Amino acid sequence: MTMKDITTALGELSDNLRTPFMLSYQGYKYEEISTHLKIPLGTVKVRIHNARKELMQKLEAYKFHDK
């Protein structure tokens, strides 16, 4: 798996998932993300969880594709 694979997988996420995930990755707290995006805290948590889950699935596919 390469950085290109990771970048591609991130690019395949919907904006609704990618934006809170990337803000979290950049060090913002969930509460800060909630305020910045003007969405409920629970929604932030669900979107980040779903983004992680989707990324893992996509990266697993790349891992098997490389073999």
Segments from the language model and where they lie:
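Helix-turn-helix DNA-binding module
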Residues: G11, D15-R18, Q26-T43
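Short alpha-helical "packing" element that flanks the helix-turn-helix/winged-helix DNA-binding module
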Residues: I6, P20-F21
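Intrinsically disordered, low-complexity basic tails/linkers immediately adjacent to helix-turn-helix/homeobox/MYB/SANT
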Residues: H65-K67
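Acidic, proline/glycine-rich intrinsically disordered inter-domain spacer in sigma factors
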Residues: M1-G11
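Short amphipathic alpha-helical elements of helix-turn-helix/winged-helix folds
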Residues: A9-E12, L23, K58
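DNA-recognition helix of helix-turn-helix
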Residues: L37-A61
